[in-house]
C-alpha cells in the first residue's frame, strides 16, 4: 500500500473522534483520503463495492452534525461492512455470483445503528461466499490477500474485513462469525476482533448461513476500538427472533457493554501495579496438543506469561470435547445452510439461468451456475443429514454433542476460571491455494473456535506476535455469557503493555 490514509495520523477511534470534534480534520477529508487508499490497495482485493458519492454524502452529513453539536459517537469515523450485511445503495452479493447485482431495499440493523452513530462507510468488503470458508478463497470475486504477505490467505470468512483493518484502509470494519469467521481472520491478519454472545447483536439483514450460530462482530486494531463499535451495534431488535431482550438481568441495549468495560477498568485501576490480580485464566490442555504449530504455541505462551506478569493466575482446565466440535459443527451448520439457501431458486431473486426447458431445469441450472463449489458441498451435506433416515443419526446427535460442549465450558467457569485463553488457529496463515485440493483442511483449522460458537459464548482474538515467515499470531480470549465488556478490558490491559496491535504491514513498530 503506497498511500497512508489520513485517519492513521490520529491513533485510535477515541483520538480520531477528538480530532474531528476539535476541527483538526473533517469527515470529508478522512473519507476522501480513505477512498484514495482503498483504490491504491486494490491488489489486496479487500473491497467489492465502493461508491464515492455515497461515502462522501455520509461524510458531509457527519460534518454537518459535528458543526451543529448533534454528532453521534462515531461521527466521521471511516469504516466498511462485510458483504454479508445488506445495505441500501451499495450492492450486496455475499461473495456469490448468485446475488451478483442485488440491490437491497433496506439496511441491516447493524448497518443502521452504526450509521446512526455517525460512522462513514467506504463500502462492502470481500468475504467467502455466503460466509462459508476459513481462507477467503471461496469468494466468487477472487481471493483476498493478506497485507502481511500477499501470498498468504487472510483467513475467513471475514477476510476482507480483517485485511482492510490490517492495512489501515479503514479505522474498523464489521464482520460475521459463525464458526470463527471474525476471530480467525483477525488472528491471521494481526488485528483485534470479537464475537459477542449469541443474541446480543441483531442478525436482521445479515445474509443467513447458520441461523443458530451467525453473530455479527467488529474488527479493529485494538480492544478499545472494538468497544467503540460493539457497544452501539448491540441491543435488542424486535425484527430478529433470536435477539435477547435482557443479558443476565440487564437490558440488552447500547451502554451495557461500555458500563461493564468501565467497571472492569476501574477494578484494574484499583489493583495498582498488578491490574489483573485475582483473574483466573483457564488454559485448556486440549488446545495445546500435537496439532498446534510450535511457532504459534510459543507466541501464545509468551502472551500468557505477560498476563501472569499483570497479576493473573494461570490454571489448567479441560474441554474434553474440543475435537468433537468439528463434526458437530459440520453437521449443524450445513444443515442450517441447506435450509437457508433453499430460497435461492432463480424465481424471486438471485441468479437465473439464461436457458432452460421447464421450471425444474430453471431452478437446477440457476443454482448450479450461481453457487460455488464450497457452498454446493455444504448444501449437499446439510440436505443429507436432514434427510429421512439420517436425521436422528447425524443432526440430532450433533445437537446433543453441542449441548455437552456448552456444559464443558460451564464446568470450567463454575469455580475453576474466569476466562479461558489459548490459540485461535493451529498455524499462521497458509499460502493461497495450499488447501485447494483438500477443502476439509480448512475445516480442521477451526478446531479452537468452533466450540465457542456452538456454545454461543463471547470470544475475541487479539494480536500476540508473529510466527514463521513474519505472519501474525492471535490469542483467543473466551468469556462466559455476556462478558464482552470484561473481555475487552482484559485485552486492553494486555495491549497497554504490548505493541503487537500497533504493528502495521511494511511499517513494523509504528502505530496505525
Curated annotation (Swiss-Prot):
GO terms for biological process: translation. InterPro entries: Amidase, Amidase_CS, Amidase_dom, AS_sf, GatA. The active site is at residues 82, 157, 181. GO terms for cellular component: glutamyl-tRNA(Gln) amidotransferase complex. It catalyses: L-glutamyl-tRNA(Gln) + L-glutamine + ATP + H2O = L-glutaminyl-tRNA(Gln) + L-glutamate + ADP + phosphate + H(+). Gene3D superfamilies: Amidase signature (AS) domain. Allows the formation of correctly charged Gln-tRNA(Gln) through the transamidation of misacylated Glu-tRNA(Gln) in organisms which lack glutaminyl-tRNA synthetase. The reaction takes place in the presence of glutamine and ATP through an activated gamma-phospho-Glu-tRNA(Gln). Heterotrimer of A, B and C subunits. This is Glutamyl-tRNA(Gln) amidotransferase subunit A. It comes from Bordetella petrii (strain ATCC BAA-461 / DSM 12804 / CCUG 43448). The lineage of its organism: Bacteria, Pseudomonadati, Pseudomonadota, Betaproteobacteria, Burkholderiales.
Amino acid at each position: 500500500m503506497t498511500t497512508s490514509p489520513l485517519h492513521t495520523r490520529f491513533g485510535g477511534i477515541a483520538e480520531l473522534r477528538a480530532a474531528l470534534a476539535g476541527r483538526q480534520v473533517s469527515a470529508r477529508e478522512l473519507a476522501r483520503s480513505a477512498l484514495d487508499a482503498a483504490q491504491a490497495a486494490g491488489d489486496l482485493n479487500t473491497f467489492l463495492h465502493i461508491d464515492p458519492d455515497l461515502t462522501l454524502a455520509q461524510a458531509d452529513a457527519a460534518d454537518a452534525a459535528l458543526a451543529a453539536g448533534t454528532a453521534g459517537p462515531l461521527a466521521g469515523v471511516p469504516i466498511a461492512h462485510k458483504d454479508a450485511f445488506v445495505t441500501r445503495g451499495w450492492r450486496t452479493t455475499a461473495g456469490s455470483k448468485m446475488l451478483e447485482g442485488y440491490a437491497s431495499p433496506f439496511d441491516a440493523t447493524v448497518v443502521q445503528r452504526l450509521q446512526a452513530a455517525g460512522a462513514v462507510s467506504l463500502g462492502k468488503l470481500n468475504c467467502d461466499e455466503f460466509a462459508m470458508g476459513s481462507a477467503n478463497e471461496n469468494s466468487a470475486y477472487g481471493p483476498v490477500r493478506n497485507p502481511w504477505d500477499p501470498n498468504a490467505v487472510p483467513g475467513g470468512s471475514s477476510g476482507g474485513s480483517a485485511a482492510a483493518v490490517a492495512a489501515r484502509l479503514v479505522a474498523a470494519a464489521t464482520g460475521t462469525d459463525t464458526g470463527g469467521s471474525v476471530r480467525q481472520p483477525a488472528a491471521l491478519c494481526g488485528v483485534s476482533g470479537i464475537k459477542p454472545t449469541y443474541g446480543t447483536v441483531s442478525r436482521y439483514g445479515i445474509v443467513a448461513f447458520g441461523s443458530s450460530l451467525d453473530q455479527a462482530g467488529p474488527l479493529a486494531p485494538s480492544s478499545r476500538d472494538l468497544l467503540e463499535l460493539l457497544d452501539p451495534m448491540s441491543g435488542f431488535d424486535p425484527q430478529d427472533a433470536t435477539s435477547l431482550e435482557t443479558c443476565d438481568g440487564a437490558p440488552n441495549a447500547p451502554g451495557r457493554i461500555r458500563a461493564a468495560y468501565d467497571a472492569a477498568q476501574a477494578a484494574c485501576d484499583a489493583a495498582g501495579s498488578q491490574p489483573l490480580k485475582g483473574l483466573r485464566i483457564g488454559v485448556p490442555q486440549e488446545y495445546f496438543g500435537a496439532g498446534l504449530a510450535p511457532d504459534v504455541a510459543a507466541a501464545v505462551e509468551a502472551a500468557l506469561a505477560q498476563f501472569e506478569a499483570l497479576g493473573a493466575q494461570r490454571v489448567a482446565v479441560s474441554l474434553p470435547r474440543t475435537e468433537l466440535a468439528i463434526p458437530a459443527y459440520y453437521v449443524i451448520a450445513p444443515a442450517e445452510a441447506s435450509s437457508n439457501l433453499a430460497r435461492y431458486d432463480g424465481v424471486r431473486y438471485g441468479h437465473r439461468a439464461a436457458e432452460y426447458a421447464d421450471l425444474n431445469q430453471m431452478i437446477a441450472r440457476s443454482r448450479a451456475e450461481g453457487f460455488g463449489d464450497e457452498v454446493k458441498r455444504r448444501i449437499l451435506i446439510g440436505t443429507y443429514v436432514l434427510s429421512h433416515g439420517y436425521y436422528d443419526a447425524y443432526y440430532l446427535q450433533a445437537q446433543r454433542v453441542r449441548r455437552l460442549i456448552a456444559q464443558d465450558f460451564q464446568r470450567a467457569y463454575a469455580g475453576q476460571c474466569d476466562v479461558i485463553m489459548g490459540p485461535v488457529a493451529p498455524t499462521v496463515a497458509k499460502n493461497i491455494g495450499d488447501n485447494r485440493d483438500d477443502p476439509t483442511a480448512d475445516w480442521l483449522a477451526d478446531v479452537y473456535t468452533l466450540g465457542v460458537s456452538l456454545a454461543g459464548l463471547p470470544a475475541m482474538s487479539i494480536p500476540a506476535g508473529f510466527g514463521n515467515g513474519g505472519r501474525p499470531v492471535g490469542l483467543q480470549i473466551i468469556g462466559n455469557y455476556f462478558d464482552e465488556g470484561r473481555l475487552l478490558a482484559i485485552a486492553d490491559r494486555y495491549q497497554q503493555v504490548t505493541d503487537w496491535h500497533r504493528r502495521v504491514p511494511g511499517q513494523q513498530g509504528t502505530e496505525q
